[in-house]
């Protein structure tokens, strides 16, 4: 079906426009007829092509390599549950079934992780490939597979690859997915066989998207060119430990044993992490380099999310003493980029009889292209994940000299390699990748990064600038790890001890792991490779020529924070600080999320259990949908006190009277407040930051958000300054900015509250005047976008979700985008709310990141657990399961989640038998 889009330009064409419109409609008609008729190029798009790529879900298929029959049972949403009698058969079948539904997604992903996108999409992807080759994810993955992964993990990866290749056998692109037919118009690309390393490489891409504070590190360095230390501190306030609780509030670090004890309620004391000085290259050269690097990072494709404040998640567990069932309930909803298909693939992997030959009985969310279950439950335990945000990357300034780099006064040779990038429809390109002892030189991959100014200022301790400094990256994922081992170990863990042992293998990305089991235990642990630094705290680039800034190792696993059965009876993780820095000796990061969501979840749980109340599965679901605006609670009382003579602005101001701060899709008050908040950020910070951090782009005349409101003389195009990609620098309006504004409100005459006059709109010299100006600007912004009549305003008209195919849905021909994309949907929720349908205040109100899935696991009866995905099981645009879960996701509904064989049988719609 075509997209259910309701967007309109709002432009009224004249005679010439009508002619163009007729031509456009004629072109669409011709293309549609080509699709139906299957003539000429339209043969690629014909109904037969579409049907050829849809998976067989009934009957039987013979697969060479199976040792016994495998049953694939799908429910009415196309979600598969696989039953086998050996581990190898189970994972081979997983590879086959995921390829049936999602191979195009898998293929694009492996080309991204290996820096080979140009082989599929041509010269437009060469720059991305150059950067990705420099990072070398596939090389690290290959080394990881060869040297660090266990024999059993390799066996499972091989079985999975065998299943994918069994699906590919005898098929060309158009038999696999509609997208290949589109690619066939422009190049002769053919899918190649899947390898075990393709699966391992996916973990590197995931780690990159969840890498932590690199953007903050760049931003702070850029700020030093214009702002003083106190101003930068204003924009990066300390974490509010006294107001927003960290994850771990019980237990202590034992200085004598060098271990953390999270099993009791005692409190510990120790010193905070070391903070060292940083490099002093503060002139135009460093600014140019870092701004260029920021642009490169912004342009890179993402694997699971956006680069920036949107990466987050909620996961919490409530112990049996506080639940209706008397057993734990565990909720999870990772916040990632809105993608089509969803990054998650729901699946069950069941051994008919659990034994040493067949060890798995697990269900949950998987990544297409990787065996095992990433988040979910087995017959004994359940677990969820949120991004920990710990700092696992550092940027180093490198002094280059000839064919080497300076290190402790000595010139060392680069480690170099030559990479060949093949380009569809064009000539191959060779690049040389250079590495220092710290890591690859990112500055080799962008022209801006090599424009090192001759006048760059450095302190007297730095080496002579010569031709300037390069930038290298030190990152934990550049070292071979064991995360793939961890996935399989988690999937079969039966208790807390086995869960903890499995988690120690989860090297990268570092995640907050939340745990519950059927024996009424709950827990939390922080695994991962987290560096210890000789000097520096990871907040700014440091001199690579001085070994005092080298990493000295990783925090010992036994010293990492955890909690087991805390006295309060629940654990909440939502990207807040893991532990109070004054109670822990190691530096985890300087850039936590600020705890807005986590504290709201904590308050919701506490309000429910105060006085002996009990929590149900549906209570957990309702908490996931909470869309209360915490920044509105802070600002609205101030806004209502402002005296505004303009009747139109007063009319909008009255929307805030009696507002309960919830951001429902139909709320006019939420629409107006969020516009005020966006304008506060623009006025207070937009003209005071270095130009490299300001919103990029020129002023544009953009269309109203949609035309679902009444047309009037104001509902025309509006001048919109500063549109930019959603994952660039501040001010994005996330909870860091909540904390910035909260603290600045204590000083209403701060220079941050000044803004110049603009046209007929007044300037401001204090907080109240700036708030007044923001209210005026917001009134006229929404008048232009939604119409003059505020009775027609709603948050959902501004805050809309579009789902776009990950490649051709953004850059393909218009007719292809029309076929592949879906939307819009009007959403409730907002930035830094529990229902985190995030938007970027610098770029508009559209939904950028979302709860990519939601689940609530019932440890009393797994068959009463609930789950939902953002889209559907299928990656095929004409499948009934392409977006069949999206409507329910939008409405906050969850689907039944069958686990027992009886429940699975009762919910089965189709059964496919894979035979040896």
Task: List the predicted regions and their residue ranges.
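Second-shell loop/turn segments in exported
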Residues: 90-94, 131, 139-155, 474, ...
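Substrate-recognition/specificity elements adjacent to catalytic centers across diverse enzyme folds
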Residues: 2-10, 26-30, 34-329, 334, ...
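Terminal end segments
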Residues: 50, 286, 587-650, 754-916
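Charged, long alpha-helical assembly modules
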Residues: 673-779
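Gly/Pro-rich active-site capping loops and adjacent beta-alpha segments
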Residues: 89-121, 384-432, 549-594, 608
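Hydrophobic alpha-helical segments
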Residues: 506-608, 662-665, 676-690, 697, ...
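Glycine- and hydrophobic-rich flexible loops that cap the catalytic core of alpha/beta enzyme folds
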Residues: 349-381, 385-548
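Stable alpha-helical elements in mature extracytoplasmic
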Residues: 113, 137, 153-163, 340, ...
């Amino acid at each position: 079906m075509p997209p259910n889009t309701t967007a309109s330009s709002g432009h009224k064409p004249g005679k010439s426009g009508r002619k163009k419109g007729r031509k456009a409609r004629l072109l669409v008609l011709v293309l549609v007829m080509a699709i139906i008729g299957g003539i000429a190029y339209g043969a690629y798009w014909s109904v037969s092509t579409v049907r050829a790529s849809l998976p067989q879900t009934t009957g039987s298929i013979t697969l060479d390599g199976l040792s016994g029959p495998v049953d694939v049972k799908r429910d009415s949403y196309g979600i598969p549950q696989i039953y086998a009698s050996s581990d190898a058969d189970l994972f081979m079948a997983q590879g086959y079934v995921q390829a049936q539904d999602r191979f195009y997604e898998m293929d694009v992903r492996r080309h991204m992780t290996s820096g080979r996108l140009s082989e599929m999409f041509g010269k437009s992807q060469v720059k991305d490939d150059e950067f990705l080759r420099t990072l070398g994810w596939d090389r690290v993955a290959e080394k990881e597979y060869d040297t660090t992964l266990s024999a059993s993990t390799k066996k499972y990866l091989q079985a999975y690859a065998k299943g994918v290749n069994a699906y590919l056998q005898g098929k060309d692109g158009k038999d696999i997915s509609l997208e290949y037919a589109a690619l066939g118009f422009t190049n002769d690309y053919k899918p190649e066989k899947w390898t075990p390393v393709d699966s391992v490489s996916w973990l590197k891409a995931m780690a990159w998207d969840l890498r932590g504070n690199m953007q903050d590190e760049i931003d702070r360095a850029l700020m030093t060119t214009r702002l003083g230390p106190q101003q930068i501190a204003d924009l990066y306030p300390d974490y509010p430990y006294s107001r927003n609780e960290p994850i771990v509030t019980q237990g202590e670090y034992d200085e004598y044993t060098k271990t953390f004890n999270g099993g009791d309620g005692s409190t510990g004391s120790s010193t905070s992490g070391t903070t060292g000085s940083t490099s002093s290259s503060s002139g135009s050269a460093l600014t140019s380099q870092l701004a260029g690097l920021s642009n490169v990072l912004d342009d890179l494709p993402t694997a699971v999310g956006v680069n920036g404040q949107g990466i987050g998640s909620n996961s919490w567990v409530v112990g049996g003493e506080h639940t209706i069932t008397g057993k734990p309930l565990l909720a999870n909803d990772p916040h990632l980029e809105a993608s089509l298909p969803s990054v998650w693939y729901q699946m069950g992997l069941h051994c008919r009889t659990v034994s040493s030959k067949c060890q798995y009985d697990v269900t949950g969310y998987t990544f297409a292209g990787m065996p095992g279950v990433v988040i979910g439950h087995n017959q004994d335990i359940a677990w969820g994940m949120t991004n920990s945000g710990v700092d696992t990357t550092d940027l180093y300034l490198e002094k280059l000299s000839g064919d080497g780099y300076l290190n402790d006064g000595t010139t060392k040779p680069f480690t170099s390699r030559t990479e060949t990038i093949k380009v569809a429809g064009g000539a191959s390109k060779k690049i040389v990748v250079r590495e220092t002892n710290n890591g690859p030189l990112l500055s080799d991959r962008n022209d801006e990064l090599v424009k090192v100014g001759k006048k760059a200022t450095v302190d007297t301790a730095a080496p002579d600038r010569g031709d300037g400094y390069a930038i290298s990256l030190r990152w934990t994922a550049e070292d071979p790890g064991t995360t793939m081992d961890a996935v399989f170990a988690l999937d079969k863990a039966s208790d807390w001890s086995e869960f903890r042992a499995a988690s120690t293998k989860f090297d990268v990305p570092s995640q907050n792991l939340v745990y519950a089991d059927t024996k009424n235990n709950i827990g939390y642990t922080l695994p991962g490779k987290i560096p210890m630094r000789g000097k520096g705290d990871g907040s700014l680039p440091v001199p690579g020529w001085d070994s005092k800034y080298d990493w000295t190792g990783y925090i010992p696993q036994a010293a990492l924070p955890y909690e087991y059965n805390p006295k309060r009876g629940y654990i909440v993780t939502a990207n807040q600080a893991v532990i109070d820095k004054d109670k822990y000796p190691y530096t985890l990061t300087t850039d936590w999320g600020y705890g807005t969501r986590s504290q709201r979840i904590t308050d919701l749980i506490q309000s429910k259990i105060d006085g002996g109340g009990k929590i149900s599965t549906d209570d957990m679901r309702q908490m996931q949908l909470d869309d209360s605006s915490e920044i509105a609670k802070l600002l609205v009382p101030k806004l209502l006190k402002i005296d505004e003579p303009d009747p139109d602005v007063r009319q909008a101001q009255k929307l805030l009277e009696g507002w309960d701060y919830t951001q429902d899709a139909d709320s006019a008050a939420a629409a107006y407040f969020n516009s005020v908040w966006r304008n506060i950020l623009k006025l207070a910070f937009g003209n005071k930051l270095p130009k490299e951090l300001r919103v990029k782009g020129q002023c544009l005349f953009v269309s109203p958000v949609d035309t679902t409101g009444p047309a009037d003389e104001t509902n025309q195009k509006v001048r919109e300054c500063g549109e930019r990609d959603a994952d660039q620098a501040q001010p994005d309006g996330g909870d860091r900015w909540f904390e910035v504004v909260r603290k600045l409100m204590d000083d209403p005459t701060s220079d941050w509250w000044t803004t110049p006059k603009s046209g007929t709109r007044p300037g401001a010299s204090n907080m109240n005047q700036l708030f007044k100006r923001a209210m005026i600007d917001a009134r006229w912004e929404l008048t232009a976008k939604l119409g003059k009549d505020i009775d027609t305003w709603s948050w959902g008209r501004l805050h809309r979700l579009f789902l776009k195919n990950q490649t051709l849905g953004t850059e393909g021909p218009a007719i292809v985008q029309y076929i592949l994309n879906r939307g819009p949907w009007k959403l409730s929720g907002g930035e830094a709310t529990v229902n985190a349908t995030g938007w970027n205040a610098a770029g508009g109100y559209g939904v950028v990141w979302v709860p990519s899935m939601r689940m609530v696991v019932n440890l009393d009866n797994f068959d009463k657990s609930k789950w939902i995905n953002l889209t559907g099981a299928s990656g095929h645009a004409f499948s009934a399961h392409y977006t069949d879960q999206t409507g329910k996701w939008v409405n906050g509904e969850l689907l039944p989640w069958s686990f027992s064989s009886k429940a699975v049988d009762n919910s089965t719609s189709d059964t496919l038998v894979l035979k040896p």
